[in-house]
Structures are given as structure tokens and as C-alpha cells.
Amino acid sequence: MNYKTVDVILERALLGDDISPQEGVVLLTQTDSGAIASIRATADKLRQQQAGDTVTYVINRNINFTNICEQHCSFCAFRRDDGDADAYWLDWAGIREKSHDAVQRGATEICMQGGLHPQAQIDGKSLPYYLKLVETIKQEYPQIHLHAFSPQEVQFIARVDGLEYVDVISALQNAGVNSLPGTAAEVLDDEVRRILCPEKINTATWLEIIGTAHKVGLHTTSTILSGHIETPEQKIGHLEKLRSLQQTAINHKYPARITEFIVLPFVGQEAPKSLRRRVGRDQPILADALLLGAVARIYLGNWIPNHQPSWVKLGLAGATEALTWGCNDIGGTLMEEHITTMAGAVGGTCMEVATLQNAIASIGRPYQQRDTLYHKVDAAKKLANTVMSNG
């Protein structure tokens, strides 16, 4: 593909136009270093226009409440069967302890997800168990933002209890869930999903659950798991579905929408052998993740202005570099993260705030703490949170 075509696409993007799926594929398949440099520069300029120069971060904690799961996704090294030596399931005291620790350390957000544990029920029902998870945290820490339960978990609860998705989402929201993680998306293409995660929800169900959350006023994030068996066309198809979903939320004036987009590069080190062989490497290729991040900024930025790399997947140096390829946020402190780390990632499981701040400062950009919904967290709010947690 010649420079002229790439330049024309990038010029249109800089004028504020949405690029087409075909144009997205053109950008994503560039191998010429000059063309890639132009894509990076355009993404960086759009990031500046759409999200500003300040790089944000969030103080949060991950709670993966169980690794027992009925599914067998081909990329997952986290799941265990009930009875495995290293299977675990946190009790209520464990949930409270981790929540207390998070708040003491200044967290404004708890991100909670877990395996699909068939025994995670109260009186033979799934939803009451999940509601108790929420209430266990919210009764003690009503001020914490609870970012919890993927579309896959929503579908699991609905299936087990014979409920509609909207009823599950509304019940979780009423109990205190503040936003839904847009995980379990992997690649929104059923051909890929049949190989990667055949037991998981299909593309239409993922889109339906996220769209339903927006309708009832629950914000969500969005993600892509990239760098395994998917094609450039399938990656762009994924971005197109997300853009369309966000356009629907905005055009229909739904009370909530997608707050951010995160590229999650595939980590294969501990993945099952069949997928490792097929992918042919254990760690993400940084250049591929950076290019996808840049194209995602160009493709989605008019509609989803906040873009985040994964320091867990890429390491902090890789994530910092992504801030010059279209990203405006460096994510959270996490405090612990089991799923990616068990897959063999090199990024680690916890970041101190100062470490994130120093990484941002190293590229000459200002930094700012934010909350889950990208509001600035100021000193007064931090103080109020600490007082409430010590009260």
C-alpha cells in the first residue's frame, strides 16, 4: 500500500472523520517504518486533541474471588477445577480483608471478577451469592467504586437462575455495582471465539449485555485480547462493533456508555500447549500492540476518548511507550492481579503510585489521579476517603 493512501486516511482522521473498516485494515497492515511512524504521530496528535496531554491513573485493587471455573478457555492459565490443590475461593472475611486493605491504601476502585464457580450459590441460586459479594464490600465501604462482573459472569448468573440479563444487571446495580468491566470480549468474532473460547458467550450476547448495561445506567469499559490467532480484518471488525455500540449509546442518549478502551496483548507462556504451538511465542510483540493501540485511537477516539495500555501484559516500559502511540491513561495500581500473571506475564501484579507517576513524567507529560469514570480525584476527595476508611 503506498504512502499516498495512508496519508489520505490519516489526513481525514485528523479532520475529525471516522475512518472505515477497510481503511482501518490498511493502517493495521502497514509494515513500512515511515508509514508506521505517520500512524503513530497521527494517533498521538488525536490523543492530544481528544484527551489532552495529562496522563491519568487510578488507585484500585483487583479481587479475583475464585479461580474455580466451569469453562476451559484455551488461553487461560488461571482457571482450576474444584478440588485442585491450588484452587481457591475467598470467604466473606477474605473479601472484607482485601477491601479494607484497598481502602487503607487509598483506593477509589475495587475491580472484582472471578471464575464461573458452579457452587457459588446461596439457597440454590446464583444471583444471591453475587449480591452478597457486592454487599460485603459496600456495607463497610459505600464510597468505593465497585467495578465488577464481566458480561460472561452476567450471562452465567442469568443462565443458572433463569433470569433476563436486564434483571441481573439491575439487581447488581441496586446492590452497589457501579460499573461493568468489558472483559470476556477477547475478539468479537465468532470464528475466533469458537477456537479460543468455545464455551464463552458469543459476540451478539456480549454486545447485548454491554448495551443493556448502558440502557440501565451502568457504565462499562471495553477491551480486546490481541496477538493470537486473529486476523487484521477481525481486529478491525472488533473495533467497528465497539464504535457502533458506543454510537448507539450516545445517539439514543442512554444514561451510560463505554468509558475506556484497553488493548490486552495475549500472553501465552502458561497457556495450554495447543494454543501456544499455534501462536508460536510466549510474550506479546510490543510493536504489534503499539500499532494496534495507535489504530484503535484513530478508529475509536471520536467516540471513546480514553485509551489505556496494560502494564501487566506489556511491562511498565512498554505501557509507557504506548502513551506516545495514542494512549492517555496508564491504568491502575491493581495491588494484585492473578489472571495475567498466572499466564506468565512479566509486568508484575502491583504498582506503587509513585512508580506510575515517574513513568509518566519520564516522557515529559503531566499526571493526574482519576476515578473509574475519569473524574479528577483531588486532595479533598482523597482525604474524605481516608477518613471514612478510618472511621
From Swiss-Prot:
First-tier enzyme category under EC: transferase
Coiled coil: none
Molecular-function annotations in GO: 4 iron, 4 sulfur cluster binding; 5-amino-6-(D-ribitylamino)uracil--L-tyrosine 4-hydroxyphenyl transferase activity; 7,8-didemethyl-8-hydroxy-5-deazariboflavin synthase activity; iron ion binding
Ligand binding ([4Fe-4S] cluster): 69, 73, 76
Keyword set includes Metal-binding: yes
Reaction equation(s) it catalyzes: 5-amino-6-(D-ribitylamino)uracil + L-tyrosine + S-adenosyl-L-methionine = 5-amino-5-(4-hydroxybenzyl)-6-(D-ribitylimino)-5,6-dihydrouracil + 2-iminoacetate + 5'-deoxyadenosine + L-methionine + H(+)
Protein known as: 5-amino-6-(D-ribitylamino)uracil--L-tyrosine 4-hydroxyphenyl transferase
